[in-house]
């Protein structure tokens, strides 16, 4: 079903299912030899969602080789996807660690999905971690982790609100202090926002961020109309491959393509000092193999860090 202005979802459908997909990839990456991440909550959270395809991946019942027996390395290759998510996860983990070392004690995770950083990272004493996502997503994850006996490693504040609504008011009502430096992440989010919504969100974060604040984002590539069809063909290839295993989701209906601002430049114009790294370089930095076919791993995605 195509996106609408007021669409909602759970973790088994629409955009929510992509959060479960990413958590399954983190579970795969956690089991890997010489793993670069350790997310002990990824597998149980995926199992709790109950999508059979992702549960089988997360538990190891279905392997990346099962999905790609001919080792074609195509767009649906789970080894490549898991490596990409491992590198991405490590990037944002390290970002929060660096922010903590710099003395930042407020962290904000936008569209947190099945992110478990509030439970698995070694936050300094006094750190407050705010998680923002749709109410159903927040409630499901909080309840599931409570049943697992998981305890937050920071002061944990959930903010059950859609980013299209008054999320700033909800965040401040939860105790966020805009006069204190903060560390923000937008991981795997911008592709699900129209270009103008991406700009608006960056402007809002800038407004809430005094000097000393930090931001890390996964920057989506601006795609001219000529590239849209190629992107959709890649997504259709993934859909066709995974449909054989009982999971059918049209990814092309979930994302927004087209021209959009380049994140580092946009932030630089608004007073942030930025740095960035490509997905390919990030994989290599993590000791993971980069894809020869850049279309498979969206190698031109850039991970941006910014300091106010």
Curated annotation (Swiss-Prot):
It holds the Pfam family LCM. S-adenosyl-L-methionine binds at residues 133, 162-163. Transmembrane segments: none annotated. GO terms for molecular function: methyltransferase activity. One of its GO terms (biological process) is methylation. It is an enzyme of class 2 (transferase). Belongs to the UPF0677 family. PANTHER family: S-ADENOSYL-L-METHIONINE-DEPENDENT METHYLTRANSFERASE YKTD-RELATED, S-ADENOSYL-L-METHIONINE-DEPENDENT METHYLTRANSFERASES SUPERFAMILY PROTEIN. Exhibits S-adenosyl-L-methionine-dependent methyltransferase activity. This is Putative S-adenosyl-L-methionine-dependent methyltransferase Mkms_1061. It comes from Mycobacterium sp. (strain KMS).
């Amino acid at each position: 079903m195509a996106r609408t202005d007021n669409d909602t979802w759970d973790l088994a459908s629409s955009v929510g299912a992509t959060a479960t997909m990413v958590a399954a990839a983190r579970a795969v990456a956690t089991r890997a030899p010489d793993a670069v991440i350790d997310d002990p909550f990824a597998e149980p959270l995926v199992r709790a969602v109950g999508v059979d395809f992702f549960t089988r991946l997360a538990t190891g019942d279905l392997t990346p080789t099962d999905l790609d027996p001919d080792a074609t390395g195509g767009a649906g290759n789970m080894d490549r996807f898991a490596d990409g998510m491992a590198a991405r996860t490590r990037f944002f983990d390290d970002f929060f660690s660096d922010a903590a070392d710099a003395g930042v004690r407020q962290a904000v995770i936008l569209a947190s999905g099945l992110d478990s950083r509030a439970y698995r990272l070694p936050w300094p004493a006094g750190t407050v971690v705010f998680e923002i996502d749709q109410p159903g997503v927040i409630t499901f994850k909080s309840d599931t982790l409570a049943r697992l006996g998981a305890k937050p490693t920071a002061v944990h504040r959930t903010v059950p609100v859609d980013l299209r609504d008054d999320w700033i008011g909800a965040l401040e009502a939860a105790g966020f202090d805009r006069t204190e430096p903060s560390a923000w992440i937008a991981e795997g989010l911008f592709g699900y926002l129209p270009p103008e919504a991406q700009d608006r969100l960056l402007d809002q974060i800038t407004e809430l961020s005094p000097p000393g604040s930090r931001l890390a984002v996964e920057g989506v590539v601006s795609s001219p109309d000529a590239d849209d069809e190629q992107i959709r063909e890649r997504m259709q290839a993934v859909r066709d491959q995974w449909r054989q295993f009982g999971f059918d989701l049209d990814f092309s209906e979930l994302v927004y393509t087209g021209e959009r601002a380049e994140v580092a430049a946009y932030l630089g114009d608004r007073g942030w000092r930025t740095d960035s790294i490509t997905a390919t370089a990030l994989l290599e930095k993590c000791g993971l193999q980069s894809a020869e076919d850049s279309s498979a791993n969206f190698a031109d995605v850039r991970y941006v860090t910014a300091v106010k």
